[in-house]
Amino acid sequence: MDIEINPQISLLDQVKIQAQVLVPLLKALRAELGEERANKLVTTALREWYHDTVLRAGALTPGSPKEKWAALTAAGMPRIGADIDIQMLKQAPDAIEFNVTGCRYADCFRAVGEPELGAVLLCEGDDHMAEVGSPEVELTRTQTIMKGGKYCDFRYRMKS
């Protein structure tokens, strides 16, 4: 199933719409199946869908893995807009390092009591994007705001 993305809708607004559907569905599944089974079912399905969607976008993007990663990243940034606060640490040909110190996405999912769902819908996408750039782009991240960290530490290494 192809997913159409409306570039005029901010990513935060899209995520809020998704949450309005997914959170009640997840709660209903928990009531029927139990929390552990429902969480596993939903996170597995969303994780696979998101992974496949990003890899499909990468396959349709021309260029080397690094060029694909750069193109998809550049295309996504306008939709993210000012909904994250970035502290740039290093920007060089072989590395990009920054911290996200504020995240309206994490605020949104904490407000509805579902930060793990937010991590699957958003944070894991960064790993999928890095996979598009592999083996030329490598992401290391040890913490995210969504999972309780003080900031999200993005450390990209670029290889030739």
Predicted regions and their residues:
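A contiguous catalytic/ligand-binding core that recognizes phosphate-bearing ligands
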Residues: 131
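Ligand-binding pocket scaffold of soluble enzyme catalytic domains
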Residues: 127-128
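Short loop/turn segments at strand-loop or loop-helix junctions that form parts
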Residues: 101
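A helicase ATPase "motif cassette" and its flanking acidic/Ser/Thr-rich regulatory loops
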Residues: 98
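N-terminal accessory segment detector
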Residues: 1-95, 104-122, 136-151, 158-160
